[in-house]
Amino acid sequence: EIRLPEPFRFPSPTVPKPIDIDPILPHPWSPRQTYPIIARRS
């Protein structure tokens, strides 16, 4: 199991959710991929 600190906690590293991005950062465990960061707007 891949354990990452917020905001890098995702149910699956290969299944992005239709969420707001803020911003696109390099994939923590795969430099060749990018992953949307969950925008924490309250």
Curated annotation (Swiss-Prot):
The entry's keywords: Antibiotic, Antimicrobial, Immunity, Innate immunity, Secreted
Keyword Nuclease (UniProt): no
GO cellular component, one term: extracellular space
The keyword Coiled coil is annotated on this UniProt entry: no
A GO BP entry: innate immune response
Top-level taxon of the source organism: Eukaryota
Induction: By bacterial infection.
Tissues expressing this chain: Hemolymph.
Subcellular location: Secreted
Main location: secreted
Function field: Antimicrobial protein. Has antibacterial activity against the Gram-positive bacterium M.luteus (MIC=8.6 uM). Lacks antibacterial activity against the Gram-positive bacteria B.circulans, L.monocytogenes, S.aureus, and S.lutea, and the Gram-negative bacteria E.coli D31, E.coli ATCC 25922, and S.typhimurium. Lacks antifungal activity against S.cerevisiae, P.pastoris, Z.marxianus, C.albicans, C.fructus, C.wickerhamii, A.niger, F.oxysporum, and T.harizianum.
Identification of the protein by name: Proline-rich antimicrobial peptide 2
Organism: Galleria mellonella (Greater wax moth)
